[in-house]
């Protein structure tokens, strides 16, 4: 599975660690060791963070924002990391975005901050701001995310239009006010999509695009491409 193959980086740790030798070797071969080390030194001096694994990752991801002006991140398998890391991540993303805007005034489109979306597997809008692990509940919205993928929408799509609109409007204008959800009907790792045979394409599109929240359009949603293909395996 995906999770079984993820790198075992201890995002909950605050313990300082050295860079892995293979990365140092790579940088030296590429002739950029001194530049990368100076950049790391500057980041840790400005932020005051310890040189723990998560802060290295935050630094490298926010470098993309400074260089390219990336204005959003979609984080995968969030439940398998320590939730507090994302608050620090969002903070540094917004700082980096400010640096990019200052350096590129002619390219600035608006005053928005970096937009962050969390994939917390099986989160549904009915849970409001919290995801229930069974033994604990975590509020990812208050730990650095503007939006969470809503795994519940494909089930709600089986209901009528009034039910969907009323439910989602109520949720997003009350306990989720200021935040949002990302709705989908089919996805690469969801084995039970709504209308897999694409027999309700107009209904699917209407519900997905007109329901409160953000819409994810998956490959084939727009063209009615069937998801039932004999002989296929995996994603």
Model region roles, listed by residue range:
Residues 15, 122, 155, 190-191, ...:
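Short loop/turn segments at secondary-structure transitions that flank enzyme active sites
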Residues 184:
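Short, basic/glycine-rich phosphate-binding loops at helix/coil junctions
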Residues 59-181, 197-200, 206-211, 223-235:
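Active-site-proximal helices and loops of the catalytic beta/alpha 8
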